[in-house]
């Protein structure tokens, strides 16, 4: 199975390392130095498990700046793009998530998209209506910084579901 992961922060890189043990993963980022680090099996973030997995495990993992190609070839796209909270407007900035969804819909509308980013209540339903896609779902992350891969390997809670109306 081919899986693309949009974003290589704590959430994206930890899920990439986890999945790349058994599937082909292409991690996508906008920052060349992060892509180069991952392709050289060095972690661009501080996380003991990620550092160890990149250095020692046989991971089927590559990183790229080319989201279009990565998403076109993917069966699943995990979206771990930043959604910073703006305390002045009291809203999450979901523009990075929406950019990924728009590109996936353009190049591979049949791919299943799993949003791991923090998003507001009702966002998944709203974006599914906007795109006309039932292949978008949300799976919240419960990760600690510097322990992200560990928390993915040994989760305290797993939850994902498409709309019950599907």
Labelled PLM ranges:
Residues 1-42:
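NAD(P)+-binding Rossmann beta1-loop-alpha1 motif at the extreme N-terminus of oxidoreductases
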Residues 24, 30-74, 83-89:
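Conserved N-terminal Rossmann-fold NAD(P) cofactor-binding segment
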Residues 73-75, 109-110:
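Short acidic/histidine-rich motifs immediately flanking catalytic phosphotransfer sites
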Residues 78:
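N-terminal Rossmann-like NAD(P) cofactor-binding module of classical short-chain dehydrogenase/reductase
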Residues 85-147:
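Rossmann-like NAD(P)(H) cofactor-binding subdomain of soluble oxidoreductases
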Residues 150-158:
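Acidic/polar active-site rim loop that often engages polyanionic ligands
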Residues 159-166:
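Conserved small/polar residues in nucleotide/adenosyl-binding loops
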């Amino acid at each position: 199975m081919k899986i693309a992961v949009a974003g290589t922060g704590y959430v994206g890189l930890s899920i990439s390392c986890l999945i790349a043990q058994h599937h082909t993963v292409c991690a996508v980022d906008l920052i060349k130095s992060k892509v180069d680090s991952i392709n050289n099996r060095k972690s661009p973030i501080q996380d003991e498990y990620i550092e160890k997995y990149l250095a020692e495990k046989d991971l089927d993992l590559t990183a790229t700046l080319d989201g279009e190609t990565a998403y076109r070839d993917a069966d699943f796209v995990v979206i771990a793009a930043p959604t910073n909270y703006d305390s002045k407007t009291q809203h999450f900035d979901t523009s990075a998530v929406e950019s990924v969804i728009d590109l996936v819909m353009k190049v591979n509308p049949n791919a299943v998209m799993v949003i791991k980013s923090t998003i507001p209540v009702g966002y998944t339903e709203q974006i599914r209506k906007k795109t006309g896609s039932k292949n978008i779902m949300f799976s919240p992350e419960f990760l600690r910084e510097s322990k992200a891969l560990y928390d993915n390997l040994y989760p305290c809670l797993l939850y994902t579901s498409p709309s019950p109306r599907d």
